[in-house]
Amino acid sequence: MNHLILIVAMCLMVIGVQCLKDGYLYDDVDCKFSCWDNEYCRKLCKSKKAVGGYCWRWRFSCYCTGLPDNEKTEGTYKCGQGRFLMGKDK
């Protein structure tokens, strides 16, 4: 009986754990969010429920820390591809 209580308690602890990840934010057309300053990225990351964020100037992209698992942090390297056709939206 004690083992059952211990197993249930451990399962509840595992279920309650929310995993967080770090990474670059991508928009709906697989482009990273460009930046020049940390404040913009901090606000953008916080709006996505991240713990924090900053502008990584080497890539001019917003990098977020502590993002929820459901946020997109990987792209397909096809930023904006197929979004415009001869200057007009599809």
Swiss-Prot record:
GO terms for molecular function: sodium channel inhibitor activity; toxin activity. Disulfide bonds join C31-C79, C35-C55, C41-C62, C45-C64. It is found in: Secreted. Pfam families: Toxin_3 (PF00537). Keywords: Disulfide bond, Ion channel impairing toxin, Neurotoxin, Secreted, Signal, Toxin, Voltage-gated sodium channel impairing toxin. PROSITE patterns: LCN_CSAB. Residues 1-19 form the signal peptide. One of its GO terms (cellular component) is extracellular region. Residues 21-80 form the LCN-type CS-alpha/beta domain. Transmembrane segments: none annotated. GO terms for biological process: defense response. It comes from the Eukaryota. Expressed by the venom gland. InterPro entries: LCN-type_CS_alpha_beta_dom (IPR044062), Scorpion_toxin-like (IPR003614), Scorpion_toxin-like_sf (IPR036574), Scorpion_toxinL (IPR018218), Scorpion_toxinL/defensin (IPR002061). CDD domains: neurotoxins_LC_scorpion. Binds voltage-independently at site-3 of voltage-gated sodium channels (Nav) and inhibits the inactivation of the activated channels, thereby blocking neuronal transmission. Belongs to the long (4 C-C) scorpion toxin superfamily. Sodium channel inhibitor family. Alpha subfamily. Has the structural arrangement of an alpha-helix connected to antiparallel beta-sheets by disulfide bonds (CS-alpha/beta). This is Neurotoxin LmNaTx19. It comes from Lychas mucronatus (Chinese swimming scorpion).
